A protein has these predicted regions:
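Core SAM-dependent methyltransferase catalytic element
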Residues: 121-137
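A short glycine-rich, Lys/Arg-flanked "PGG" loop and its adjoining helix->strand segment in the class I
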Residues: 59-71
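Acceptor-substrate binding/catalytic loop of class I
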Residues: 53, 85-101
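A short SAM/SAH-binding and catalytic strip from SAM-dependent methyltransferases
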Residues: 42-57
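A short acidic, Gly/Pro-enriched loop at the edge of an enzyme's catalytic core
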Residues: 32-44
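Conserved beta-strand signature within the Rossmann-like core of class I S-adenosyl-L-methionine
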Residues: 72-79
């Protein structure tokens, strides 16, 4: 397809696994310590990842992701559907956004909405646990 994927992973072990199994460049970093080149990427795919970013850091992280996209670049993200509550599941932190809050964050950090939807298909929308959204720089 002509894509040249680059991975970002917080676990050094998973970085090595991803590099070996894909042959792609995979950076060892997390959203808190992003160090991506500016205006480099046509698209970012952040599936089940951004909700692990602490609420007080999400605006900065989203601006940095926006900065790393080329003009008119696209961001896809998917987060568990929630009511703006935060907490831990074992040792894993999560902030569970509702649509209005997530939309406000994305708009305030320079993104334009393309579409949003709840997934997976095949069950009533109000029971779908994942909020997916697509944004343009």
């Amino acid at each position: 397809l002509g894509h040249i994927p680059v991975g970002v992973e917080g676990s050094e072990t998973f970085v090595e696994i991803a590099r070996k199994s894909t042959g792609c460049d995979v950076y060892h970093m997390d959203f808190i310590n992003l160090d991506l080149p500016q205006m480099e990427y046509d698209g970012i795919f952040a599936n089940a990842a951004l909700f692990h970013t602490p609420r007080q850091e999400i605006n900065r992280v989203m601006r940095e992701l926006n900065d790393s996209l080329k003009k008119r670049g696209v961001l896809f993200c998917s987060n568990p559907r929630g009511d703006n509550q935060e907490g831990f599941s074992g040792e894993r932190y999560g902030f569970y956004y509702d649509w209005n809050t997530w939309k406000e964050i994305c708009l305030n950090t320079g993104f334009e909405e393309i579409k949003h939807f709840y997934r997976p298909d095949g069950i009533p929308e109000e029971e779908r646990p994942w909020l997916a959204s697509v944004w343009r720089k």
